[in-house]
């Protein structure tokens, strides 16, 4: 995936707007991906805005985690990142415009009266309407108060959603939401509308838990006289059991998936398939996803996290990834585990990865498959291998050693041919010497076919390990 800004050939502008109160959740990552894909598909722009108006809950650690996750996934903003809290003056300016045009009002409701009104609304009564909606100000208009939106009392508000289709809301059920708190801080729905307008956002693609907000935000857009963006509310991600995704379902943060050894391209591919698809295509490149993606094709039903499908998709990307990159990632994973490594571990991994990567689903599995190549001579043989080294087997391995030492080309096909011809010349099945040879070369670690093991180890290391074992039986 390229991180360079896309040339803008359309007026489409999407945005990802996380709240920095925690890690980058895979649900948020998928939202970012859908916005990124749609912007690239249309030749538009993908922007990022940090919605940090809640200063008490927002943390720099969370901001850093979000950007680390986006960077790892390869999705960077095409313009400078916007931090919402820095736009507070602009938000208050918009509220003043609503006050001036009669679309907002000051509310001095007491805490007690507000609690009663909310309780009545929850009990099925009318949506919250402040008695100050049409009342003159109190004797002391400077007393603490909030500013509320003055929404319509009747009629309906239509959200023509790109995913859900037309959704109609009864205005009588939409309360007069607070725009500015008593301390002058703007609220979410107000800030979102102002920022999306000022950033030129044309398509708001987000989780369908925001669908109700779309109606309220539509009314604010209309009151401000601004052009509405297109809304697309995508389904949430559920666990394999259909329940809301939670810790009991396993990893949730993008960083956790990275630590578990998934590749960014594998996770991107998998997340794209959660709620969207292109026919029967399961595995595809970024270029194909960009070509095929349209938010209108996102399904309405919640997607379920499927670990087996994720592992399969990631394995397909791992199998075609560049060997040098995989070797570097494997080395980092081993270092993070604190595993003792030989000085030439990078070279050993580079030689081993091509031979074992097809059997791995993640970088962590790849590290396990490479373990045999990182062992330092002399290897400690398992009891099973020692028991296999009978006098007959040792003599046979000595004859094999002589042929291996004379093979002119040390390669996969050459070693495969040699092993087959040796078994034929000995008049025995492979089982008479193969298991013991495997144990000698790997020390009992998981490993691929013998010709791949020896190709990964190279001539000198393979013969050295065999010589060590034969010498121990001398």
UniProtKB/Swiss-Prot annotation:
One of its GO terms (biological process) is glutamyl-tRNA aminoacylation. Keywords: Aminoacyl-tRNA synthetase, ATP-binding, Cytoplasm, Ligase, Nucleotide-binding, Protein biosynthesis. It catalyses: tRNA(Glu) + L-glutamate + ATP = L-glutamyl-tRNA(Glu) + AMP + diphosphate. Its EC number is 6.1.1.17. InterPro entries: aa-tRNA-synth_I_cd-bd, aa-tRNA-synth_I_codon-bd_sub2, aa-tRNA-synth_I_CS, aa_tRNA-synth_I_cd-bd_sf, Glu-tRNA-ligase_bac/mito, Glu/Gln-tRNA-synth, Glu/Gln-tRNA-synth_Ib_cat-dom, GluQ/Sye. Its main location: cytoplasm. It is found in: Cytoplasm. A motif ('KMSKS' region) lies at residues 244-248. The keyword ATP-binding applies. It is an enzyme of class 6 (ligase). ATP binds at residue 247. A motif ('HIGH' region) lies at residues 18-28. CDD domains: GluRS_core (cd00808). GO terms for molecular function: ATP binding; glutamate-tRNA ligase activity; tRNA binding; zinc ion binding. PROSITE patterns: AA_TRNA_LIGASE_I (PS00178). NCBIfam families: gltX_bact. Monomer. This is Glutamate--tRNA ligase. The gene is gltX.
């Amino acid at each position: 995936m390229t991180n360079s800004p896309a040339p803008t050939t359309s007026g489409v502008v999407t945005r990802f707007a996380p709240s920095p109160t925690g890690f980058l959740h895979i649900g948020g990552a998928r939202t970012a991906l859908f916005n990124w894909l749609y912007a690239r598909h249309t030749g538009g722009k993908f922007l990022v805005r940090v919605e940090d108006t809640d200063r008490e809950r927002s943390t720099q650690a969370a901001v850093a985690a979000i950007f680390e996750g986006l960077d790892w996934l390869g999705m960077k903003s095409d313009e400078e990142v916007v931090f919402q809290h820095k736009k507070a003056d602009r938000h208050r300016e918009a509220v003043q415009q609503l006050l001036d045009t009669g679309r907002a009002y000051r509310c001095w409701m007491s805490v007690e009266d507000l609690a009663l009104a909310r309780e009545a609304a929850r009990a099925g009564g009318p949506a919250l309407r402040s008695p100050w909606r049409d009342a003159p100000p109190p004797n002391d208009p400077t007393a603490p108060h909030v500013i509320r939106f003055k929404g319509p009392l009747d009629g309906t508000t239509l959200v023509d959603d790109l995913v859900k289709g037309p959704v109609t809301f009864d205005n009588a059920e939409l309360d007069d939401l607070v725009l500015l708190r008593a301390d002058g801080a703007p609220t979410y729905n107000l800030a979102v509308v102002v920022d999306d307008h000022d950033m030129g956002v044309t398509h708001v693609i987000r989780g369908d838990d925001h669908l109700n907000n779309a109606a309220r935000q539509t009314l604010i857009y209309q009151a401000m006289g601004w052009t509405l963006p297109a809304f697309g509310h995508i389904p949430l991600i559920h666990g394999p059991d259909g329940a809301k995704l939670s810790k009991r379902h396993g990893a949730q943060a993008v960083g956790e998936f990275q630590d578990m050894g998934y590749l960014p391209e594998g996770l991107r591919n998998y997340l794209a398939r959660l709620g969207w698809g292109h026919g029967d295509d399961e595995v595809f490149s970024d270029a194909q996803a960009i070509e095929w993606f349209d938010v209108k094709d996102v399904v309405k039903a919640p997607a379920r996290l499927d670990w087996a499908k994720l592992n399969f998709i990631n394995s397909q990307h791992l199998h075609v990834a560049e060997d040098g990159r995989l070797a570097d990632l494997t080395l980092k994973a081993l270092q993070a585990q604190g595993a003792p490594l030989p000085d030439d571990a990078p070279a050993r991994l580079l030689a081993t990865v091509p031979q074992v990567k097809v059997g791995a689903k993640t970088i962590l599995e790849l590290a396990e498959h490479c373990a045999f190549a990182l062992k330092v001579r002399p290897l400690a043989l398992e009891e099973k291998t020692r028991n296999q080294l009978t006098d007959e087997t040792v003599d046979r391995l000595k004859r094999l050693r002589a042929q291996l030492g004379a093979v002119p080309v040390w390669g996969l096909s050459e070693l495969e041919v040699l092993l087959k011809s040796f078994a034929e010349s000995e008049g025995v099945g492979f089982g008479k010497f193969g298991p013991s040879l495997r144990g000698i070369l790997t020390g009992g670690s998981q490993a691929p076919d013998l010709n791949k093991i020896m190709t990964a180890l190279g001539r000198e290391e393979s013969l050295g390990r065999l010589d060590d074992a034969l010498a121990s039986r001398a």
